[in-house]
Regions:
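Conserved phosphate- and dinucleotide-binding cores of soluble alpha/beta proteins
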Residues: 2-146
Length: 146
């Protein structure tokens, strides 16, 4: 597990990268954020060709607000401004990707994931290029046209 409270985030990224790269990854479970982010790879700063495996990122206001909406924190002020995240290429390296996206607040993100051009405007759109990605949605998050 990544230690988000590590005293040295850069060293924690290196430690986890070594673990991650030690063996092939069979399954990666992930979600899609309200703005189309995957992990903390927010639009438009997500990098589909990122050379890193794990990195420190600055969380934008939309991502921080989602942490409150998801009841992870009581207020935006309590949400950290930075986080550790797997990069997009690291996630895409899994043999199977199981993506769970429940809730009406994710309907637009699911629409953009499935319908928009593949770009960092909706980082989750890259999931369409993975041959073994399964998207699990509920009635509330399913776009009408899907």
């Amino acid at each position: 597990m990544l230690d988000p409270k590590s005293e040295n985030p850069e060293e924690e990224c290196k430690r986890y990268t070594q673990l991650f790269l030690a063996e092939p990854i069979d399954i990666i479970c992930l979600g899609i954020g309200e703005n189309g982010h995957i992990a903390f790879n927010d639009p438009p700063v997500a990098d589909f060709a990122d050379p890193e495996t794990v990195k420190v990122v600055e969380l934008d206001q939309a991502c921080r607000q989602q942490q409150v909406n998801d009841k992870c924190f009581e207020s935006v002020e309590k949400v950290p401004t930075h986080a550790l995240t797997l990069t997009v290429p690291a996630m895409m390296s899994g043999q199977y990707l199981f993506t769970v996206v429940p809730g009406s607040n994710k309907k637009n993100a699911v629409h953009h994931t499935l319908r928009d051009d593949i770009s960092t405007k909706c980082p989750a759109s890259i999931l369409r290029t993975h041959e073994n990605c399964v998207l699990f949605v509920d009635v509330d998050s399913l776009p009408v046209e899907a």
